[in-house]
Amino acid sequence: MPKMKTHRGSAKRFKKTGSGKLKRSHAYTSHLFANKSQKQKRKLRKSAVVSAGDFKRIKQMLANIK
């Protein structure tokens, strides 16, 4: 059986925390900031944790990430 390969696109987007959760960044942060409120832009700066429903799928893509 061949080795599982890490999905490189996912590896660049997710980081594992010390407790084993996955950190992610928010979408909608690349352009068109004039249309967004200051509050929305401030909230988008913070990182978020991957939801439980997506965790299993993403963990499988990140097979070899420690």
From Swiss-Prot:
Gene3D superfamilies: 4.10.410.60. Residues 1-26 have a biased composition (Basic residues). GO terms for biological process: translation. The keyword Nucleotide-binding does not apply. GO terms for cellular component: cytosolic large ribosomal subunit. PROSITE patterns: RIBOSOMAL_L35. InterPro entries: Ribosomal_bL35, Ribosomal_bL35-like, Ribosomal_bL35_CS, Ribosomal_bL35_sf. GO terms for molecular function: structural constituent of ribosome. Signal peptide: none annotated. PANTHER family: 54S RIBOSOMAL PROTEIN BL35M, LARGE RIBOSOMAL SUBUNIT PROTEIN BL35M. Part of the 50S ribosomal subunit. Belongs to the bacterial ribosomal protein bL35 family. This is Large ribosomal subunit protein bL35. The gene is rpmI.
